[in-house]
Amino acid sequence: MRKIIVGSRKSKLALTQTNWFIDQLKALGLPYEFEVKEIVTKGDVILDVTLSKVGGKGLFVKEIEHALLTKEIDMAVHSMKDMPAVLPEGLMIGCTPKRVDPRDAFISKNGASFKELAEGAILGTSSLRRSAQLLAARPDLQVKWIRGNIDTRLRKLKEEDYDAIILATAGLQRMGWDNEVITEHLDETLCVPAVGQGALAIECREDDKDLLQLLAHMNDGVTEKTVAAERVFLHKLEGGCQVPIAGYATLTENDAIELTALVGSMDGSVLLKEKVVGTDPEKVGLEAADRLINQGAKELILAANKEQQ
């Protein structure tokens, strides 16, 4: 019986996601056993600066990918939104399980909704994507950076001067905390989710044919298609955590992909948004990127990068 070593970050959420996925694989009843190897990533260690200042995308996966390439582990369970648009040679996304709720969760100290927040209220987020879109809707708000895992951020909301914070609904759901803590779900029209938000990426080596066959059982075709369109868009714009960039695709009743793509200025005063519908994920992603580039997205990205240097 082959033992599959599964790499995971050490956070509660990462381990919850990893163990959930292993349970799904075990339920298939195939001759494999599993062991979790916990790995510390750069993103887990550097908590005193915003993600965008320390290298953005890839911060939570580089060390894990190194362990895959050196065969210390056989596969890894990641949050799709942490995945860089391009993977190292020899690695691939072996499967994309069914996506859960992609929306952002708004959590306020006193139960006020986003619209009800007092003028000048302090909103905690470490995401340029969230801050740009929410400042566009409420320019009166003050954004204050907040880092750390879910428990840390919820504690900071209680103990520090934040009036509200934003977290991914998916993470709270996976921890079983969504009903307790979420004040409201932010509609995708108000705050377009991050590329891949709510989805998991199971990464493995391209040449591990046995494992790829096993992972195929867990692949969700709709999630694979929609996330592929989002990631093509992200790659074309070379966007990471350093830029207010968002992309969320769904499948229509006719099986067409509908992608909403957005690039913004850091302060939210400019938001460029496009909706593209098509059947081919690659074409849809490229079309969305091209349309935004024609509107001036590249200039916004350059300005955002400059602002953070």
Swiss-Prot record:
Keywords: Porphyrin biosynthesis, Transferase
Matches recorded under CDD domains: PBP2_EcHMBS_like
Family under the similarity heading: Belongs to the HMBS family.
Cofactor note: Binds 1 dipyrromethane group covalently.
Superkingdom of the organism of origin: Bacteria
Name this polypeptide is given: Porphobilinogen deaminase
Residues with S-(dipyrrolylmethanemethyl)cysteine modification: C241
One MF annotation (Gene Ontology) recorded for this entry: hydroxymethylbilane synthase activity
InterPro entries: HemC, Porphobilin_deaminase_cofac_BS, Porphobilin_deaminase_N, Porphobilinogen_deaminase_C, Porphobilinogen_deaminase_C_sf
Coiled coil, from the record: none
Function: Tetrapolymerization of the monopyrrole PBG into the hydroxymethylbilane pre-uroporphyrinogen in several discrete steps.
Other comments on record: The porphobilinogen subunits are added to the dipyrromethane group.
